[in-house]
Amino acid sequence: MAFVGSRIWSGFPEPRFICGKNRVSPGQMDPELFFFSGCTLRCVYCQNYHIANSEVGKTVSVERLSEIFLELQEQGANNINLVTPTHFVPQIIAALDQARKKGLNLPIVYNTSGYEKVETLRRLNGYVDVYLPDFKYLDPEHAKKYSGAEDYPEVAKAALEEMVRQTGNPVFNDAGIMTKWCNCETFVIAWVSERCERIVKYLYETYGDQIYMSLMNQYTPLDNV
């Protein structure tokens, strides 16, 4: 399948993406992943460097993106997982509007770095069923050093609060599959491992059982990282 990326065309920017599969939670079938090229952060340990830091891929129109959503539903996809979609929110909303008019009813997963403006998330209210934000830092110095975003902790805290407000407590369907919830992901990196303990403590003390947490341990040193 094609990429949805960051090249700006006349009139309306057209996204580009790469499709894949990944398991969102126990009990769920594999969703379709849409990796949008480009990223709002510049993490020195990025595991998707070739996607986040380039215009790799094939551009598609909003109309074509809406058609792809519908095609995936017809093929039996369980949900649609949008990865690093922040800089294409207007186009995604337009594509979802078009697809819903034609019968799209799959849950939408918003898979993000957590570096989100609250006003952007509010535009997504009613469109997103599942939020999968990273929560990378509580220390501004770490955020600046490793991701170039000193304000990440405060931005991510406010963003997560809005995500939880929208999703509420986890919702399960009759098959025991979660259809509405918020899951925070924290990347485990050896040289700043103490940050994970602080983050887990903060998330639990703040949200308790309202959210799920995932500790990601797949860090691999890569070229250009």
Task: Please name every model-derived segment.
Residues S61-R64, V155, W191-R195:
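Soluble or luminal CAZymes and related metallo-dependent hydrolases
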Residues N79-N81, P107-V109, V130-L132, T179-N183, ...:
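Structural preference for beta-strand elements that scaffold enzyme active sites
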Residues A52, V89, G114-K117, F135-P153, ...:
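Conserved radical SAM core fold
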Residues Q73-Q98, K145, D151, E161, ...:
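Conserved glycine-rich "GG(E/T)P / GGGxP" loop and the immediately following alpha-helix
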Residues K144-D174:
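Anionic-ligand binding region
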Residues F3-G126, V130, P140:
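Conserved Radical SAM active-site core
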Residues N125-P140, Y212-Q218:
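Non-cysteine beta-strand/loop elements that form the S-adenosyl-L-methionine
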Residues M1, G168-V225:
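Auxiliary Fe-S-binding modules of radical SAM enzymes
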